[in-house]
Amino acid sequence: MPLLDSFCVDHVKMKAPGVRLAKSMKTPKGDDISVFDLRFCKPNEEILPEKGTHTLEHLFAGFMRNHLNGNGVEIIDISPMGCRTGFYMSVIGTPSEEAVKKAWLASMKDILEVKDQDKIPELNKFQCGTYKMHSLDEAHAIASKILAQGLVIINNDEIKLDVDAMGLKKH
């Protein structure tokens, strides 16, 4: 099995919260695709709470589109990482990390403006697979923490992991 890109970065050195361009590629038709690592938590030190992450997923996706889509950029998907330290965002186009950072911060402010659980998009049994697993309070706490700490741009060269030199397994 090939070693995935996400396992070729040193999670010990990774700063958080921060934005990282995880991958860029071209489709066979020549379209640019960018994948961003939106790291909310320092890996192996903290994780996002389950219910707050789920609520954030419902809110963050729409707000990021409001702030980032346009001028050749369109968000394909924003999904939480299995390790619960952040989200991956796939985008058509090549927005700068600074533009992503600005949109992320604006989205966190928008999340704090949502005052009622009933205002969470698609929060019903027809559109959400676990519609009872939400917490607006936890989502607010996550957003507040990001705004208080600010965001860094994560440099890929600084966190590149040499799996051969470290003797790590490549499955």
Curated annotation (Swiss-Prot):
It catalyses: S-(5-deoxy-D-ribos-5-yl)-L-homocysteine = (S)-4,5-dihydroxypentane-2,3-dione + L-homocysteine. Its EC number is 4.4.1.21. Keywords: Autoinducer synthesis, Iron, Lyase, Metal-binding, Quorum sensing. GO terms for biological process: quorum sensing. One of its GO terms (molecular function) is S-ribosylhomocysteine lyase activity. Signal peptide: none annotated. Fe cation binds at H54, H58, C128. Its cofactor is Fe cation. Binds 1 Fe cation per subunit. Homodimer. Belongs to the LuxS family. Involved in the synthesis of autoinducer 2 (AI-2) which is secreted by bacteria and is used to communicate both the cell density and the metabolic potential of the environment. The regulation of gene expression in response to changes in cell density is called quorum sensing. Catalyzes the transformation of S-ribosylhomocysteine (RHC) to homocysteine (HC) and 4,5-dihydroxy-2,3-pentadione (DPD). NCBIfam families: PRK02260.1-2. This is S-ribosylhomocysteine lyase. It comes from Campylobacter concisus (strain 13826). The gene is luxS.
